[in-house]
């Protein structure tokens, strides 16, 4: 027992030295007893000793925390107190126990309005100093000719008395309206207004493309054509920046309706018109691919449909008017057939209003779905008159491509030489076409030569030249 008593008498000095030297606390020595690194005659006495030392250590730690709270508690700003109270209300983790103690002090908030512009924090605090449980007073920035403020009380009775005092006694010539709550309100102070404006600016910036993305979009639109790779690159860009769908849609429409060239001499240039036609078709194909991805379930791509919908009718009307500028019936028919295919796909998807798509389909296809049975006699007369008028204007300008490049026999060409002098309709040409003889077989089938106009520009066989 002597050894134990001696050890008990000497250990407190060692423990105080360990505190001063900031070594590991004595609590950790219990692990050494568990590992049997220190031998003792009685385990019960060791447990009693360690329990006492642990209690001393915890008391010392709590004293240091209280001391730190008293040193820094008065230097806390009102904004920090409000934030800590809000964190405590939301059950968020607080860094240390000092924060919890400080939040527990804030119980009742007195929100003040109609404060005179002359009133300051000091004068208002002097008026409310008679209430002992007051913690903090603060006046926020002016809103017009009024000010708002807040006072924090620990005791409910003091808060109620303060409200009565402010409502009945004028401070700097004004009665202050006050209300009591047990939680802070969002007050329109300068910092809060600045933070709200920052959040609005950030939200607006998210809806806009960056300068680099905007330049990339303009570059992709400028080089857009009907090739799959060109359309695919712009489609990927639109899907990746789906949050900026409004700005991207505006860029598409701006390019689509921009038919005025930089040089006025190109207004009636065939190359420029063909280039614009390809650009418009490529934008229609791009819209079709974007709508398909929206229907197939790609994330948020359906937003583009709502951006396109208000402009679909104007867009299709512009396409129909542009088809009349292509300068040829063949070009116009090819252009209209490509647009009709896209419109039919949109009708099956029910992508836009059915009436708009139906009217556009009639314009481009030239059909009337309401009356599918057409008078055949009237159709023959109409086609006959139209082809007669065209033959008078385009006489002698037939090309080999109309006949797939198949050469014509020399004898047949000589027999029908007089036909080239007179513009003929389909009926007269069919009656005057020569029939093939039995001695020499014709190069064409009767069904091909009948009802056609043979051009002088056909090439001859090499064997017929000698």
UniProtKB/Swiss-Prot annotation:
Entry protein name: Uncharacterized protein C11C11.01
Segments of skewed composition (Basic and acidic residues): 188-207
SUPFAM superfamilies named among the record's database cross-references: RNA-binding domain, RBD (SSF54928)
Gene3D superfamilies in the record: 1.25.40.90, 3.30.70.330
One GO term (biological process): mRNA cis splicing, via spliceosome
Gene Ontology cellular component annotations, sorted alphabetically: cytosol; nucleus; U2 snRNP
Keyword Electron transport listed: no
């Amino acid at each position: 027992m002597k050894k134990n008593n001696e050890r008990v008498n000497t250990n407190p000095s060692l423990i105080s030295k360990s505190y001063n030297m900031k070594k590991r606390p004595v609590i950790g020595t219990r692990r050494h007893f568990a590992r049997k690194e220190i031998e003792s005659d009685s385990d019960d006495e060791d447990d009693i000793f360690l329990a006492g030392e642990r209690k001393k250590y915890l008391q010392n730690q709590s004293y240091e925390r209280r001391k730190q709270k008293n040193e820094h508690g008065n230097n806390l700003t009102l904004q920090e107190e409000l934030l800590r109270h809000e964190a405590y209300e939301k059950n968020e983790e607080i860094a240390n126990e000092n924060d919890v103690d400080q939040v527990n002090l804030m119980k009742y908030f007195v929100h003040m309005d109609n404060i005179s512009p002359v009133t300051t924090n000091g004068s208002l605090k002097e008026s409310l100093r008679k209430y002992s449980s007051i913690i903090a007073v603060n006046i926020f920035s002016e809103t017009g000719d009024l000010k708002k403020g807040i006072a924090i009380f620990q005791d409910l009775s003091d808060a109620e008395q303060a409200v009565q005092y402010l409502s009945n006694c004028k401070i700097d010539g004004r009665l202050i309206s006050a209300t009591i709550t047990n939680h802070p309100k969002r007050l329109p102070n300068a910092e809060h207004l600045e933070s709200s404006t920052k959040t609005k600016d950030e939200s607006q910036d998210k809806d806009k493309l960056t300068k680099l993305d905007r330049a990339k979009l303009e570059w992709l639109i400028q080089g857009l054509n009907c090739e799959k790779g060109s359309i695919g690159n712009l489609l990927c860009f639109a899907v990746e920046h789906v949050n900026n769908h409004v700005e991207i849609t505006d860029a598409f429409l701006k390019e689509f309706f921009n038919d005025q060239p930089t040089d006025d001499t190109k207004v009636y240039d065939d190359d420029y018109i063909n280039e614009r036609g390809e650009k418009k078709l490529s934008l229609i194909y791009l819209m079709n691919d974007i709508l398909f991805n929206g229907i197939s379930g790609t994330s948020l791509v359906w937003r583009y449909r709502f951006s396109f919908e208000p402009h679909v009718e104007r867009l299709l009307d512009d396409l129909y008017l542009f088809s009349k500028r292509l300068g040829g019936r063949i070009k116009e028919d090819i252009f209209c057939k490509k647009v009709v295919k896209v419109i039919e796909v949109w009708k099956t998807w029910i992508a836009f209003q059915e009436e708009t798509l139906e009217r556009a389909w009639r314009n481009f296809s030239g059909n009337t779905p309401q009356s599918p049975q057409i008078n055949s006699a009237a159709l023959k007369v109409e086609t006959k008159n139209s082809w007669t008028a065209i033959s008078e204007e385009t006489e002698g300008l037939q090309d080999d491509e109309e006949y797939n490049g198949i050469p014509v026999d020399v004898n047949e060409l000589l027999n029908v030489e007089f036909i080239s002098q007179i513009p003929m309709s389909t009926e007269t040409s069919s009656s005057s076409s020569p029939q093939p003889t039995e001695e020499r077989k014709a190069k064409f089938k009767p069904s091909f030569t009948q009802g056609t106009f043979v051009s002088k520009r056909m090439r001859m066989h090499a064997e017929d030249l000698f």
